C-alpha cells in the first residue's frame, strides 16, 4: 500500500498574490498522474485573469479534449487550479473563501473518518478481515471520529459484525436504507 503523497499547487499572479490548491490524487500512482495533469493544464492559465474563475471552468470543461469525459486525473487537475483561483480571489477581495461561496452555514462541522478500507492513522494496508475493519473503526473512534465512511458495503458489514458503535455514512455507489 502506497503512502500519502499529496500534490499541492501554487498559482502566482502578476500582482504578487498566490493561491494554493490540491490535486486530489494522493495515494498510489495517482500523485504522479496529478503532477502530469497540472503540467499540462498550467500553460492554459498563464496570462489570464485569475479572478474570472468560471471562464477557466468553461474552458477546461468544454474546450479541451478531455474536459467532458476526462475522469479522475483530469478533474483533479481542474479542481486544484479552481481551488487556487478561489484562494486568490478571497485574498484579492479581503474575504474568506466561504463568504464568496455563499457565507457560513454552520458554527461547527461534523467530520468523519474516510477510506477506512485502507486502515487508519499511520498504518496503511488493505483491510481483509472483519477484525481488521473493526480495529480501524476503533482507532478512528479513539480520536473522536464518531462518523465513519466506508467505500464498500461489504466493509460496513464486516466492521459491524465485530463493532456496533458506529454511525454509517455511505457514498453514491452504495445503497443502505438507514432509518
Regions found by a protein language model. Give the residues of each.
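Short, Gly/Pro- and small/polar-rich lid/capping loops
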Residues: 1-10
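Generic secondary-structure boundary/loop-capping signal
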Residues: 5, 17, 42, 57, ...
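Glycine-rich, aromatic-flanked loop segments that form ligand/cofactor-binding clefts
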Residues: 82-118, 143-146
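Metal-dependent enolase-superfamily TIM-barrel catalytic cores that perform enediolate-based chemistry
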Residues: 108, 112-179
